[in-house]
């Protein structure tokens, strides 16, 4: 059983993921964010709706295993990363890039 993640909604969303795949998903009104690894889908949905004033249709999450990193003979682990793909309602938009 997982522990509940009790925090402010602003702490759930870390940053947007800007890759080629995530940029192509913008055409389908899907936005990709890096979120806290303890956050659940309802918390992610509530955070996106509160921070950006949009209507969220669906949330898909990816929680890959931590990657190991080696420096010389010392081995360590990178921080846990969880990604959320958020699908917005028709007509809603999130401004990720500044217009110039």
Curated annotation (Swiss-Prot):
An example of a GO molecular function for this protein is: rRNA binding
Alphabetical list of PROSITE patterns matching this protein:
RIBOSOMAL_L23
Q: Keyword check for Secreted, yes or no.
A: no
Q: Entry's InterPro entries? A: Nucleotide-bd_a/b_plait_sf (IPR012677), Ribosomal_uL23-like (IPR013025), Ribosomal_uL23/eL15/eS24_sf (IPR012678), Ribosomal_uL23_CS (IPR001014)
Question: Which BP terms does GO give this entry?
Answer: translation
Q: Which UniProt keywords apply?
A: Ribonucleoprotein, Ribosomal protein, RNA-binding, rRNA-binding
- Record-level GO cellular component terms: ribonucleoprotein complex; ribosome
NCBIfam families the UniProt entry points to = PRK05738.2-4, PRK05738.3-1, PRK05738.3-2, PRK05738.3-4
UniProt lists the family membership as follows: Belongs to the universal ribosomal protein uL23 family.
Assembly and interactions? Answer: Part of the 50S ribosomal subunit. Contacts protein L29, and trigger factor when it is bound to the ribosome.
Q: What does this protein do?
A: One of the early assembly proteins it binds 23S rRNA. One of the proteins that surrounds the polypeptide exit tunnel on the outside of the ribosome. Forms the main docking site for trigger factor binding to the ribosome.
What's the protein here called?
A: Large ribosomal subunit protein uL23
